[in-house]
Amino acid sequence: MRLAEVVRNTSETQIRVKINLDGTGQQKLATGVPFLDHMLDQIARHGLFDLEIEAHGDLHIDDHHTVEDTGITLGQAVAKAIGDRKGIVRYGHSYVPLDEALSRVVIDFSGRPGLEFHVPFTRARIGTFDVDLSIEFFRGFVNHAGVTLHIDNLRGLNAHHQMETVFKAFGRALRMATELDERAAGQIPSTKGSL
């Protein structure tokens, strides 16, 4: 089993992430941001990752630091669980619909952080959650997991549906990319010999 636990403590947040990449989708989430917990649940369930996240942040100011630092810590945990990246598929992609919404996520465990985020949300907030924080979450993740990530919402009228399809597709693409390829066991999936 590929397991990792990462603790991140700053003056703004205290976050603990524990992940099992070879899990069954079990989750225990307590970030203090209910909508973020809902989205993290999508990652765990659709990625089949066992995921525990506990966060304490400066929510009296706003959700920004908690959301961003959760992305950072999750990225660190995924990178730690994968290790040297030998034998992983490396690339993953997924399309996910939800009623009128459709999103595509493509990921590459290249070792080169990069984010292309194209989601034209139809409103600025989902309940009390600022939709701009989703890009901060994913930026934190890519910078600390060392991945290239393309996120495109292809259509959607309901912002909740747009967001949910993005996180579901991300979980499924992440699962695909981190799976072990039996035919490439022990090999780095790159002609360079390293990632």
Swiss-Prot record:
Keywords: Amino-acid biosynthesis, Cytoplasm, Histidine biosynthesis, Lyase. GO terms for cellular component: cytoplasm. CDD domains: IGPD. InterPro entries: IGPD_sf (IPR038494), ImidazoleglycerolP_deHydtase (IPR000807), ImidazoleglycerP_deHydtase_CS (IPR020565), Ribosomal_Su5_D2-typ_SF (IPR020568). It comes from the Bacteria. Pathway: Amino-acid biosynthesis; L-histidine biosynthesis; L-histidine from 5-phospho-alpha-D-ribose 1-diphosphate: step 6/9. GO terms for molecular function: imidazoleglycerol-phosphate dehydratase activity. Its EC number is 4.2.1.19. It catalyses: D-erythro-1-(imidazol-4-yl)glycerol 3-phosphate = 3-(imidazol-4-yl)-2-oxopropyl phosphate + H2O. It is an enzyme of class 4 (lyase). It is found in: Cytoplasm. SUPFAM superfamilies: Ribosomal protein S5 domain 2-like (SSF54211). GO terms for biological process: L-histidine biosynthetic process. PANTHER family: IMIDAZOLEGLYCEROL-PHOSPHATE DEHYDRATASE, IMIDAZOLEGLYCEROL-PHOSPHATE DEHYDRATASE HIS7. Belongs to the imidazoleglycerol-phosphate dehydratase family. This is Imidazoleglycerol-phosphate dehydratase. It comes from Paraburkholderia phytofirmans (strain DSM 17436 / LMG 22146 / PsJN) (Burkholderia phytofirmans). The gene is hisB.
